[in-house]
From Swiss-Prot:
HAMAP family: Malate_synth_G. This is Malate synthase G. The gene is glcB. Acetyl-CoA binds at residues 117, 124-125, 273, 310, 538. The keyword Transcription regulation does not apply. Its EC number is 2.3.3.9. Pfam families: MS_C, MS_N, MS_TIM-barrel, MSG_insertion. GO terms for biological process: glyoxylate catabolic process; glyoxylate cycle; tricarboxylic acid cycle.
Amino acid sequence: MNRIDAHGLKIAPVLFDFIAGEATLRTGIKPDAFWAGLAAIVRDLGPRNRELLAVRDRLQARIDDWHRIHKDTPFDISAYTAFLTEIGYLEPEPETRQIETANVDDEIGKICGPQLVVPLTNARYALNAANARWGSLYDALYGTDAIAREAGEAKGYDKARGDKVIARAKAFLDMATPLANGAHADVAGYSVLNGRLSVTLRNGDTTGLKAETQFAGYQGDANAPSAILLVNHGLHIDIQIDRAHPIGRHYSAGVADVIIEAAISTILDMEDSVAAVDADDKVLVYRNALGLMNGTLTDTFEKSGKTLTRALNPDRVYTAPDGGQLTLHGRSLLLIRNVGHHMFTDAVLDQRGAEIPEGLLDAAISGLLAIHDINGVSKRRNSRSGSLYLVKPKMHGPDEVALTCELFARVEAMLGLRENTLKIGIMDEERRTTVNLNACIQTASKRVCFINTGFLDRTGDEIHTSMEAGPMIRKGEMKTQPWIKAYEDWNVDIGLIEGLPGRAQIGKGMWAAPDRMADMLAQKINHPEAGATTAWVPSPTAATLHALHYHQIDVRKRQQELKAGGRRARLSDLLTIPVSHSNWPPEDVKQEIDNNCQGILGYVVRWIDQGVGCSKVPDIHDVGLMEDRATLRISSQHLANWLHHGVVTHDQVMDSFKRMAVIVDEQNAGDPLYKPMAPGFDSVAFKAACDLVFRGREQPNGYTEHILTERRREAKLMAQAARAFSGEADTGSPRENATRQ
């Protein structure tokens, strides 16, 4: 590659051209000024980035030594806590101080609801997520197991199933927006009279809403509106009325659908759900982000023999009760997740020819792209408060948060953005951040817009941090351990006392089974009940259904109750290490190995061979689960731990990998791009899976990215060589990195 030199940086041509020809257009930023600013950031902050990574390694070595020394003595939580304090792992908790974050959008500070995470490498999925602000409740109930399917249901539209859906939707309306008299199922017609909702029942009586303030607006003629807009707990409900519609003509009041606010916010992901290993991949990520920031992104595709084009939805316009115009945001508020401090990219090399910290590049380009939105260039405005929300993952403690804040300040200065334009979302997914969360938040007190728990990454770090303490319990038992409950409560407790409500989100993790919506409806209500203002969902449909929970729970009221009750989580529980003192029967050990190996292979083979960073992967029981690098981290670290402590042998794990490869091959038999791993077991993907376990203990903090990146680059080079040998044009990856939802 003939790199382009700019201010001491050596830049991949594809990235250089993107900045000059696309990213800087209509921003007022000259490409040369951008590279000069980035060069200064790399020069000044690059060494600090590397030093903080060295601190991680030094602390891990000290902890490993402590566990080796105390291996044959009963675990002493007091001695352990004192040790963590002595080495600087556990820092003094600062006095409580309210955050000062300003200029946040209502989706961050006021509205509680679901949050999507979508890979930025796939334009169509990113557009679907951005447009998932509003979702059809009828479709979500009809098309999933939220309502159990009966034997003999008709193909296409089944009237009996449709009746159940409509009954469920009307029961929801009765719960969220009850009438003063009667039920929504009894309504013969909706109209607007003197700025109030007038409801005619089938018996001829007239009523209204029990709480008249829940009427927010309408579309069409006041006497025969085409839509009625209601609101509950800050979330809007759009009752679509069309008596000529195939659904509406069969039911009272002509209700054709109930559209509800669903994905209030969406994280555009540059990190765990993408496989971006080189400059070409990074430019794909950045180009899609640009299209979302300036409102021009489209995606054209074939479906059922038709050519369809997706674009960002417009805002929704209603007549307000007072006769004025009410405009509601038509799209999910977009946040961007950059990579962590531990990642480096060859898209740009420094003066020494070394890869630069990838997070520096992500922050600089994210800030540049946001100018298209902040300065009003965008056709579809994202932030109306003039902020950019950057989620920063995998930070270890307040010093690393401080580095991110300084980086954001430098980006603002180089781009001429208002101070504190760049907000920080703190992923509470590493153990040292958890135990020092109060200090982390205060370090970013003028920028923090989000804290979030992530069970899987957090468990991966739990295992790696205490690798020398002993064999860990079985993976499925982790959610019952004292540390995990303390972790979830600790995050909310600290978020409340630090004053996040009204200024920042308090988030919870992903529902990983996109086909099990009945289970999600039964279980994920726990997140708003826990005081979380948002929680992750795997699809737009899941967002629509999870939104129902925020109508059931008044999160702001629940937060006040929790805050009044005082802090619940204890540090001693948080530091309780999930080691096992059991001897498992051989069949349990085999089951654990097989489950882990199958999950690792099912995810890694798509990552390496096809560049798919997040997808629905069938587990060993053929249940589709959303997999990304977080799920891979826990599985690989768990097996590495059991190997290290002699619970399993190298031969047992390798035997399982080979048996599971056959199963994974069978599960992917319908994919024309899939490359089988059996019977040779010598593919790059199979080797990568083995590396993740057999080299797992030596990976910094148990991260999987370094091995995946190394092996994906190898696979891409092999594919390029094969195309060159056959005389084919080099078209890159056979498939965009995509979430199969």
